Amino acid sequence: MEEIIKPVSKELLKAELTEDRRLRMTNKSNNQIYIITHQNAPNVMREIGRLREIAFRAAGGGTGLSMDIDEYDTMEHPYKQLIVWNPEAEEILGGYRYLLGTDVRFDEAGAPILATSHMFHFSDAFIKEYLPQTIELGRSFVTLEYQSTRAGSKGLFALDNLWDGLGALTVVMPNVKYFFGKVTMYPSYHRRGRDMILYFLKKHFNDREELVTPMEPLILETSDEELRTLFCKDTFKEDYKILNTEIRKLGYNIPPLVNAYMSLSPTMRMFGTAINYEFGDVEETGILIAVDEILEDKRIRHIQTFI
């Protein structure tokens, strides 16, 4: 494990967070959302790399390097970084990186050069019909001090703020119809709890078209029969009650991002789970969300407020 780099000077960060890179104000907390790249804001990128590595290590993942910056952040046509900036404290609350489907390059074999390409296989149907209208999201993080379990009300809105940013992207890029991303579970999470969550997601959100498939699908440790007996209800709501109760019995909670995605859209598609051996063996579940099928209250909150 390398020692994490020291914080980047606030003056250097502010110099790179220029008005032309500001996307919007957030609905809550009066924070600001910026979009940068490694090329136009190298100091902000270093600070993102530092904060990501701290957050992911604390959860049981991470690269083990002094900061989490990889070739997808730094390549010639890199992922863009969407960050939430607290102008009062002059610090980054959290962020995502993203790539527009129309900006995706392909390798010599015709496979898309995506941060998830080493874990998932993308069907021709996905590449032709979905990818050009998709934003791929990754490396979602909330800075440790702003995580709601630690920060109380200060952290409550960090994820909410991030989604204001994603909502704004769909407005400034109206051709975007889908978000493709991953839900991450950590090896430290209770194994039976993980199996229950993944079984529940598969039961209610399974993608039957096999648009995207894990190259090495994760095998659950709990028997299918046991999970089928447990989640025996007809509706998402009833099964969700069971899931929540059972996870709490284990002394755990459903991870916040898993909860958040499930409540975003009833038509979310789940593509199965792969182990990310390059990132602390975390378990990544691929998901696709259609922008126009995001539940109305969420759409009003994160998208309409920007129009």
Locations of regions flagged by a protein language model:
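Conserved donor-binding loop and adjoining core beta-sheet/short helix segment
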Residues: 64-71, 77-112, 118-128, 132-142, ...
